[in-house]
Amino acid sequence: AVPDKIDPRESGYVTGVKDQ
């Protein structure tokens, strides 16, 4: 996935979508 921003509190999640 290409995240707009990565939330370090939600590791493995980008813009609310799980990046696999």
Swiss-Prot record:
Subcellular location: Lysosome
Start-end of Basic and acidic residues biased regions: 1-10
Region Disordered, residue ranges: 1-20
Transmembrane keyword on record: no
GO-annotated biological processes: proteolysis
Domain of life, per lineage: Eukaryota
Catalytic activity annotation: Specificity close to that of papain. As compared to cathepsin B, cathepsin L exhibits higher activity toward protein substrates, but has little activity on Z-Arg-Arg-NHMec, and no peptidyl-dipeptidase activity
EC number: 3.4.22.15
Disulfide bonds: none
Enzyme superclass (EC): hydrolase
Keywords for this protein: Disulfide bond, Hydrolase, Lysosome, Protease, Thiol protease
GO MF entries: cysteine-type endopeptidase activity
Cellular compartments per GO CC: lysosome
Record's function text: Thiol protease that assists the parasite in burrowing through the gut wall and liver of its mammalian host.
Subunit structure: Dimer of a heavy and a light chain linked by disulfide bonds.
Protein family: Belongs to the peptidase C1 family.
Protein name: Cathepsin L1
